[in-house]
Amino acid sequence: MNDGEAFDYIVVGSGAGGGTLAARLAEGGQSVLLLEAGGDPRLLSGTNDDQPGINRLPDDYDVPAFQGFASENDAMRWDFFVRHYASDAMQEKDPKYRRYYRGVPVNGILYPRAGTLGGCTAHNAMILVYPHNADWDGIARLTGDSSWNAEAMRQYFERLENCHHRPLERVLAAAGVNPSRHGWHGWLQSEKAVPAAALGDFGLVQVLLDSAAEAFEDVGQPIEQLLDLVEAKADPNDWRLVTENAVGVRYTPLATRNHARMGARERVLETAEKHPDRLRVELHALVTRVLFDDHNRATGVEYLKGERLYRAHGQPSTTEGELRQAQAAREVILCGGAFNTPQILMLSGIGPRTVLEPLGLQVRVELPVGKNLQDRYEVGVIHRMNFDHWNILEGATFNRGDRAYREWADRREGVYISNGAVLAAILKSRAERPLPDLFCFALLGLFGGYFPGYSSVTVAKPNYLTWAILKAHTQNRAGEVTLRSVDPRDTPLIDFNYFEEGSDVAGEDLDSVVAGIRFVRRLTAKLKADGLIAEEEQPGDARQTDEELKDYVRTTAWGHHASCSCPIGPRDGGGVLSSDFRVHGTERLRVVDASVFPNIPGFFIVSAVYMVAEKAANVILSS
């Protein structure tokens, strides 16, 4: 690409926000430059710390069961080390805390991000779960913009989805009857992954049946609906369940095509192939700042051309990169995510004066960029089973060439078509809550959060069962992203200010997570009595009181859905963006990614970001 070349739109970042938006703008007839700091994960060579010298790509990208390894593949991973607490004494209680990594001071907890084409859709667990209607209605009330209400927003899910896990509903939709309001012709395929071999694993079947029966009773769901799990009716994305029956046992749809990962990468490349004259994808391009004229109009971006330039990269380069510029005839749209979009804005002079001026940056527009950072709290209830291995995992090494891999590669069958989740339950932590706030799901493996090497630990012992608990709708809005330095290759400083350090002074979040642990213990009580579970290793039977469980949650909780750091809302109320994604105090500059939400939506962030990107494309093309 020629330095200074002009396009209608420049989109920065190719994840769920940027990749989706760039493709839709190009389909709408606009010329688009999509800038991505990383490379194409299916064309790179990459390994992980436990298997040096062995290239695990493209399998780490493609194979659903390898999703943990994808997040630690050094060709595409960006390692952020974040603080959960400002207090060193509190932070160091977390066993995931690292003072140093690879000899470099990091002083935090690993927070895996993906610096690659497709962004975090290249390494996530592919779970596609619809947000709550109240999430959209809340934005509509905050902004006075009715186009954000839940009824209006559903069209964007229908536009992007190509549902393949409701065959009967698909037939009805072809006849013009679509009460589920799934999408059937969108670009993102969704599937249900239930390996047939699971039915032959009697230990697993008993675990699933006993856990499901207890969960049905606990949430007040008729046990007769257990068959819905088999018949694909326990669908968390069905419009009727979203609006009328939000609690219960569910399966977890995955964003896969023919049981291989599908995400923003596929959307971008397939659109670029159809419209090469409209969509230009520039890889290995690290954006350093937005360029403006004298009237705060965005005119383009400055970026560094070169591989592995960002210091979060798994193999950061020591070269400086080539400084280039690109011009936008219409708009610049930042889609770098909840960490990198605030960083780019602040390096461009848009942010808190208290952050910019001490670093010698001129304040162009003073806005609370980087404030309001939110995430979900997650913890694991980890069990060692009373047998050597799950039968379904026999012979599985999670490497290319084993029997399970051949089943996946040759026939798209077997355990590797799944991300490891086998059952989920949605519930309220307290009966009086207006919305469900807990998503509890069972995983075959040992998973207690993120630390260097976690992906190998998760699958190393084939006789573990982890119930992961996600706490939605946090009360804590005290997280913050700030600049470490004026060097765009440095990572920002990130502090989530967990629990009592944050804004949840009443302790509602902590109480809710403890309620989730007690729910899981009710599900597993029969499994323990029947001798299937040998031991609850974490939190462990020694922790029984509320205070003991709260201490466990405080010291081990994690998150991986960072959002809300450039929220939509009135400027005088702490908002950074207008309801049409424009940055307050500027022209021709928008943000479209997970940072735009005033409050973190639903249980899993990616479906909401995809929807936001589709809405943004509609807004931009309509204007």
Write out the residue ranges for each language-model feature.
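N-terminal redox-cofactor-binding region of secreted/periplasmic oxidoreductases
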Residues: 1-623
